């Protein structure tokens, strides 16, 4: 754990040079969540590391899964690096049509916390406020403090809807073309981006 650091810049450079690749970000947010994995031995190790509850079970004798509650803490250096990595990938990959907003729900964070990630992507000032709460020695291990990019609303719509739909071949989804599925979410404009995306005015399907 002492050598834990981000290599997102290297991954993003490779990604940007290879236009045939798509990826999801698997972002992490601080706070309580539950980890679920088919890697039973790792879940047992996580249980040992945290001292939290643990459950492992077989699924139809073909595979298994482990479940362990977990808290990502900004004061924890490893957790802080994990938090930075997902944001770095989203910000350093140039083409929003090929990188998708996810949290590996619920492992990294629950999907209903996406508005928090959206605010982190759209506001460099908010990112800086959050980074100020991290351990001082993290700055040599991550790239995030050097990134000034801020997402536009168009780019947010792309990584959340249009991009995934195109990558999956769901031609009826993710766009407003004639004859396409009219799945719409309308928001009341608000300078607080996290609040705006947390409280849609209308959801139309």
Residue ranges of model-derived segments:
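C-terminal cap of metal-dependent C-N hydrolases
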Residues: 181-205
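His/Asp/Glu-enriched, well-ordered alpha-helical/loop segment
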Residues: 63-67, 76, 83-187
């Amino acid at each position: 754990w002492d050598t834990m650091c981000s290599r997102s810049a290297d991954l993003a450079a490779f990604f940007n040079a290879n236009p045939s690749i798509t990826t999801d970000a698997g972002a992490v947010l601080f706070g309580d969540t539950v980890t679920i994995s088919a890697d039973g031995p790792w879940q047992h190790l996580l249980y040992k590391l945290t001292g939290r509850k643990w459950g492992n079970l077989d699924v139809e004798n073909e595979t298994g899964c482990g479940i362990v509650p977990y808290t990502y803490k900004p004061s924890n250096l490893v957790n802080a690096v994990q938090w930075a990595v997902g944001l770095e990938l989203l910000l350093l990959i140039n083409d929003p049509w090929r990188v998708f907003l996810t949290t590996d729900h619920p492992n990294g964070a629950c999907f209903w916390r996406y508005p928090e990630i959206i605010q982190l992507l759209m506001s460099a000032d908010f990112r800086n406020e959050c980074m100020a709460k991290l351990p001082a020695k993290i700055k040599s291990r991550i790239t995030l403090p050097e990134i000034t990019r801020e997402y536009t609303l168009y780019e947010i719509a792309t990584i959340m809807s249009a991009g995934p739909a195109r990558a999956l071949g769901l031609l009826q989804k993710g766009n407003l073309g004639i004859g396409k599925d009219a799945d719409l979410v309308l928001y009341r404009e608000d300078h607080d981006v996290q609040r705006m995306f947390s409280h849609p005015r209308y959801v139309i399907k």
